[in-house]
Structure formats: C-alpha cells, structure tokens
Amino acid sequence: KALYLKQRTLLERFEPMKLTKKNYLRQMHRWLGLIAGIQLLLWTVSGLYFTLIPIEEIRGDHLRLEPEATPVTNHQWLSPRQVLNLHPDLNTKTSQEIRLSHTDGHPIYLIGSVRLDALTGKKLDTVSKQQALDIVQARAKGRITGIDLVQSVDSDSEYRGRELPAWRVTIDQEEAHFYVGAGSGRLLAVRTNAWRWFDFLWALHIMDYENRDNFNHLLVQVLAVLSAITVLSGLALFVVTLRARGQTAG
C-alpha cells in the first residue's frame, strides 16, 4: 500500500495542472505583475519623492532673497492706455498682461517680455549681461560662478516653455541656475538638483519622456488599467485561496 501511494504521488506531480479558477487567476496575476510591476514601482518611488521634498525647496525658494522695496518718487508716468497707443503692435495684449515694475528706481511697464519706459513710453533695450548679474546678485543666496545667454532649448530642457532668450546665472549653491528674461528682466525660474530629480521622476511618473508635460496619453492609460487589473486579480486570488483553505479545513 505504501508503494502504491508513492507511485500515485509521483504521477500526480508530473500530471498537467488543471486550469482551475485559482490557477487561472494566479497565472494572470503573475503576468500582469511582470508587465505592470516595474511601472507600479516607479509610480511609488516618484510619488514618495514628491511627498518627501517640499515644493518650496524644489522651486529653489530657499535660495531666493526677497527683493527690497524701492520707492518710485516720480509719479508723472504714462497710463497703460497711453503706452499701448504709442505701440500699436502691442495693442493685442490685454490689460491683465501689463505689469508696473522698476529698474533701479525708474518705473517701467512690462508687457509680456517687452520693457517700456513708464515716463516716455519708449521701448528699452534688452537686459545686458551686467544687468542680469546685478538682478541675480540682489535675489540669490550665494556667490555667482558663471553666466551665459540661452538662445534656444530642447523640449526636455530644465528651462522649457519660458521666455527666450534668457540669461542663465549659476551660483555656488546646489548647482543652481537662475534664469533672467533678456527681454523682461524678470527672474523667471530657479533650477536646482532637487528640481532636476523632480523633473526626471515626473517624466517617469507620467510616462512622457520627451516633453514631460502630458499625462493624458495612451501609454499611461494602458498601464494604469493593467495596474488596476493586477491589484484586482491579486484580491480575487486572495479570496479564492481563502475559500479553498476553508473548504479543505472543513
């Protein structure tokens, strides 16, 4: 009898496994986990980074100095309407895009990336290298180590989608770059290593590896559906296994 049981056990071991409901769920869960598991891990790791690093640090706010208030004593400047009348090519701009600012205490209007003298209405020259250095020196915590003019950028650049040309000023803190619009003279962006890691992980998170801005595309939708099915199949497998154990125990 012992020999018979041993032979039967060996036969059962090499007998093709029947595709029961539990086996089907297990196989499906295994393959789905293989396909979607890597992206699930990337979503988790990137999401963890997003929650651990404060957004203020990513934006480089801790490296910025608040600009000092500069009183403008001459109030004989032109109104926005008068300035627009002097420049018909800028008349397509809406009043919401007009900013009142100053350069060394002199009032100016900013219309997009164009600077206009608020007293005369004349267009001002683009920001010089020295002016860009002065702007960053007044706004950055750290020592300036370099400056260059950025004329164009790639679609995945750390300075994509912003005013060009722009001055890129490097300081000695966290390999930070301060970007100053050559036309507007505004400090438009600060890029640090924390931001670069954020940008890289963001590309992995939304699966847009080129422009890093679009999360409404087919690839991320398919992986999201597969990930949901993976989780649901795992839950179903747990329930089926639990019931099978209950029946065996009974």
Identify the residue ranges that each predicted region occupies:
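Conserved histidines in hydrophobic membrane contexts and catalytic metal-binding motifs
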Residues: 17-250
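Short, Lys/Arg-enriched N-terminal segments with co-localized hydrophobic residues
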Residues: 1-16
